[in-house]
Amino acid sequence: QRTRVEHYIALARDAGARVVTGGGRPAGLPRGWYVEPTILAGVDNAMRVAREEIFGPVLCLIPHDGDDDAVRIANDSPYGLSGGVWSADAERGLAIAKRLRTGSIAINGTYPPFPRVPFGGFKESGLGRELGPDGLHSFLEPRSIGLPAALRPDAGN
């Protein structure tokens, strides 16, 4: 996994991104799977680091020209498991969150899974839902039985 994350950081550099912080192995930890938390600037949404799941501590900073452009960039992804919106204006944050194509969205914080709320992604981020009533349905096999009139509950009335 460490090799994979380091490969993505190298790809980003080769494509013109700049490492703002991190990008290597933590000092004093030459062994193990550790990679420094890394921030990449100058990332374009067409770069692999912006389009693929890295599964490591890498944050890509992608510039935008306002809310509409930010939503366009965020939705221009084959994935949509979860997202986050940060805004000093809660109504603006909610308006933006409603436009994002992700299965769950946090506004000004994190979104922990709640047992009673469905969890799952859009697009290529998973199939179906976990948790909540929607998650239960995948474990059920509903069926219907047609009853003759004599066996119906209201037959004696």
Model-predicted regions and their roles:
Residues 19-22, 107-109:
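General beta-strand structural signal in soluble alpha/beta enzymes
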Residues 1-4:
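Structural signature of PLP-dependent enzymes
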Residues 27, 34-157:
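Conserved C-terminal structural/oligomerization subdomain of aldehyde/semialdehyde dehydrogenase
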